[in-house]
Amino acid sequence: MRCPHCHKNGSRVVDSRPSEDGSFIRRRRECIHCGFRFTTFERYEETPLLVIKKDGTRQEFSRQKILNGIVRSAEKRPVSMERLTKIADKVEKQIRSIGESEVSSQIIGKFVMNELKGVDEIAYIRFASVYRQFKDVDAFMSELETMMKAEHKK
């Protein structure tokens, strides 16, 4: 690694520590030429993940798109932004745990709906209405009835 002080290549690792969440490693380094100490942060490189859309086109996965959809569905609902961000994080983790380089948008939608269902039913219905593209009111009512039956069983 190039020293930020003398700009020569060559350093040794003095100390390594993982972050609290394990997403990166903090390393203290010392230049073997001038003795200057500096810190680096290393992240693992994720393999690109492609989403297969309904029309068959492929698009690079975007966590931000998921978060935007979740935020839109929970608009004016008593759900904190922190909670919505955690949902997006959990969905991304589920998608990546599949271990495939491509995943269908239907699978992503199901993961999001599963998470929203346990957090806010109105946000769930809003998301489902866009995701499932209900053809008519009957299809929408059928989903509501299914949800209400599940609620009464609790």
Curated annotation (Swiss-Prot):
InterPro entries: ATP-cone_dom, NrdR-like_N, RNR_NrdR-like. It comes from the Bacteria. Residues 49-139 form the ATP-cone domain. The keyword Transcription applies. Keywords: ATP-binding, DNA-binding, Metal-binding, Nucleotide-binding, Repressor, Transcription, Transcription regulation, Zinc, Zinc-finger. A zinc finger (unnamed) spans 3-34. This is Transcriptional repressor NrdR. The gene is nrdR.
